[in-house]
Amino acid sequence: MGSALAEEHLGRPPRVAVLNIGAEEIKGNDLVKRCAEMLSQTDAINFVGYIEGNQILHDVADVIVCDGFVGNVCLKASEGTAQLFIEKIKTSIMASTIKGWIARKLFSRLFNELKTLNPPDQYNGASLLGLRGIVIKSHGSADVSAIVNALGEAVHEVKRQVPSRISDRLEAVLLERHY
């Protein structure tokens, strides 16, 4: 399902990986191993193998498969790490010492670049997949701009008929497994 949605955005088959505690096939629980085995047996998905937690942000995969609990923990841990990193740098920059002055000079340009890299209001909302319609779940701290962008994503998914494309892809994968 994530592969079909990502392909709509990327314009190419996405790289799909399963989140695991290691890259070796012997690692992981039964659910993770079965999932990887199923994905590796279909030509309809560009499966690239396992991905570890420390690789999530390193452009190893376009779609990362995991259960909802693990995915939510990863998302919130990433958010928390980024927030802590920014707070620490801001504290250093705001210090009225020579160290603070140097930090301001070094990091001000970097901060401006980072602000434009992934603005949270532009990428607000997660598509709930596997439904017959479109549902976009927004972040609890979303502002008006973020909600507008989430609505734009919903309109895009309606125009591209994403639920039926996902259904078609899923049907192809299931048929492939039975023949």
Residue spans of the language-model regions?
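Glycine-rich beta-alpha junction loops
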Residues: N20-E25, I51-Q55, D67-G71, G140-D143
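Glycine-rich phosphate/diphosphate-binding loop of Rossmann-like nucleotide-binding domains
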Residues: M1-G53, D62
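Glycine-rich phosphate/nucleotide-binding loop
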Residues: V60-I64, G68-Y179
